[in-house]
From Swiss-Prot:
Protein name, per record: Putative complexin-1
Function (record text): Positively regulates a late step in synaptic vesicle exocytosis.
Recorded family membership: Belongs to the complexin/synaphin family.
Pfam families: Synaphin
GO cellular component, one term: axon
Superkingdom per UniProt: Eukaryota
Keyword check for Transport: yes
Chain segments carrying region Disordered: 16-72
Length: 143
């Protein structure tokens, strides 16, 4: 209890003393964010200095890069040129199984179709598939 009374008495006197020294917060000029305009101006100036410093550094780096390019006869990459990638593939678009089957069934374009051997080829395919299925049951790799 005595500590509380002492704090109350000394606290009031301390705030009066600090108010007399100019440490009192009078709520002067503040912006919407609650910051002093001088602080904001200083931050903006500091940001501009930082950006200018980085611009200078990048210009120096570009001069160094250009010197290396000149020394070793390296061409600068064009920034505007973009390579056209189709879903990450370098080649053309991949054909679907339906498109491949349609190409296989185009008898007029193939040599077998022109010679009239389509029926014999189909019979050979059927026999080979049947033989493979029969043999596959005997070996462990087919299971």
């Amino acid at each position: 209890m005595a500590g509380f009374l002492m704090k109350q008495m000394v606290g009031n006197q301390l705030s009066e003393v600090t108010g007399g020294l100019g440490m009192k917060d009078d709520g002067g000029e503040k912006t919407e964010t609650g910051e002093d305009p001088e602080v904001i101006a200083a931050r903006l100036e500091q940001e501009e200095r930082r950006k200018e410093k980085h611009r200078k550094m990048e210009n120096e780096r570009e001069k160094m890069r250009q010197g290396i390019r000149d020394k070793y006869a390296i061409k600068k990459k064009e920034e505007g040129v973009a390579m056209d990638f189709t879903e990450g593939r370098i080649g053309g678009p991949r054909k679907t199984p339906e498109e491949i089957a349609a190409e296989m069934n185009a008898e007029d374009d193939s040599l077998i179709g022109q010679l009239g051997l389509t029926e014999q080829v189909e019979k050979a395919k059927t026999m080979a598939t049947g033989a493979f299925e029969t043999v596959k049951g005997f070996f462990p790799f087919g299971k």
